[in-house]
Design a protein with these regions (language model features):
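N-terminal secretory signal peptides
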Residues: 1-23
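N-terminal twin-arginine translocation
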Residues: 22-27, 37-51
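N-terminal cap/lid segment of alpha/beta-hydrolase-fold proteins
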Residues: 48-79
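Short beta-strand element of the alpha/beta-hydrolase
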Residues: 83-92
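Gly/Ser-rich "nucleophile elbow"/oxyanion-hole loop immediately N-terminal to the catalytic nucleophile
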Residues: 130-172, 297
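Primarily recognizes the serine-hydrolase "nucleophile elbow" in alpha/beta-hydrolase
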Residues: 154-215
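Short beta-strand/loop motif that positions the catalytic acidic residue
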Residues: 219, 225-227
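C-terminal catalytic histidine-bearing segment of alpha/beta-hydrolase fold enzymes
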Residues: 252-298
């Protein structure tokens, strides 16, 4: 993704854009310039962060072989369920941290083998960065879409060997991963996708030659887009352009839907941030589960 798009995304997800919970513009600026993931979490984390236990689950870290590289991945699955359907979980820009792992456990409790590969692993570790600007410039912008899609293919291959039912596979992703969700829904490897506030259009680059808006004619799985009406990084005009394109796209594109939460900012599902909006997050989660069931991923 072009570094300008990444900067816009980072500013949108910071707590400085959530003034009613006490975060100021100064806080946001500090976070962009140097406080990284810790700044995105802020003290609000202790108040709202959801912790899902692993009772009845098998969970932990595994390695996924992909083009000669072992990609670390966090996986959670029901301990007693054979051949569970598979959900690929795609990270935010911060990598597969505690929140993304918790999302996997939530999906596992719903009956899925949920797996989140570290899609930056070849380029470095997101956890090594304390500054969002450096994280964007030195890591995130260096990750090619082609590599990401191939690693997701390899993750499905691993899941199949581990007993997952990849004939009933879906993908969901947040922010950076929301964009990836749209792209992967065009590959034919999944039956459905749920994209949480993923960028829909932007500057093309060598590593990100195309964006979701340009791929609606290639979409092979219907996607549910969950977006915030107050997202400063993804204007509603962009959502409207995507909706118009979907209406004239492939069969899967025409079956895709958007839900916009008028008062929600970017990252409204991220319960460890000040951007968290409980009502929108819970409603979106129920819509995710229903979307998967209604498209045969259950």
């Amino acid at each position: 993704m072009d570094i300008r798009d990444l900067h816009t995304d980072a500013v949108a997800l910071l707590p400085g854009h959530t003034t009613e919970q006490g975060a100021s513009r100064r806080t946001a600026l500090q976070a962009v310039l140097g406080l990284g993931y810790a700044a995105a979490a802020m003290p609000i984390m202790a108040q709202t962060a959801v912790t899902t236990d692993a009772k009845g689950l098998k969970e932990g870290w595994v390695t996924v072989p992909s083009n000669g590289f072992d990609v670390p991945a966090y996986v959670a699955r029901p301990a007693a369920k054979k051949n569970p359907p598979v959900v690929l979980v795609v990270q935010e820009i911060f990598g597969v941290h505690a929140y993304i792992q918790d999302v996997c456990r939530r999906l596992a409790h719903a009956g899925y083998l949920a797996i989140a590969p570290e899609l930056y692993a070849r380029q470095g570790k997101a956890s090594d960065y304390t500054e969002i600007a450096k994280l964007q410039a030195e890591l995130v912008s260096k990750v090619p879409d082609e590599q990401v899609l191939q690693d997701l293919d390899a993750t499905l291959t691993w899941a199949a060997k581990a007993g997952g039912n990849v004939r009933k596979a879906a993908i969901t992703g947040f922010c950076w991963g929301g964009r990836v969700t749209w792209l992967y829904a065009a590959t034919g490897r999944v039956k459905a996708g749920v994209a949480w506030y993923g960028r829909l259009e932007g500057q093309a680059s060598a590593n990100t030659p195309s964006h979701p808006l340009a791929q609606v004619t290639q979409l092979k799985a219907p996607v549910l887009g969950l977006y915030g009406g107050q997202d400063t990084g993804i204007p509603m005009a962009s959502v409207a352009r995507m909706q118009e394109a979907l209406a004239h796209g492939s069969k899967a594109a025409q079956a895709s839907e958007f839900v916009v939460y008028p008062d929600a900012p970017h990252a409204f599902h991220a319960d460890y941030r000040a951007s968290y909006r409980e009502a929108a997050a819970k409603d979106g989660w129920q819509r995710l589960l229903q979307w998967l069931r209604s498209h045969g991923v259950a």
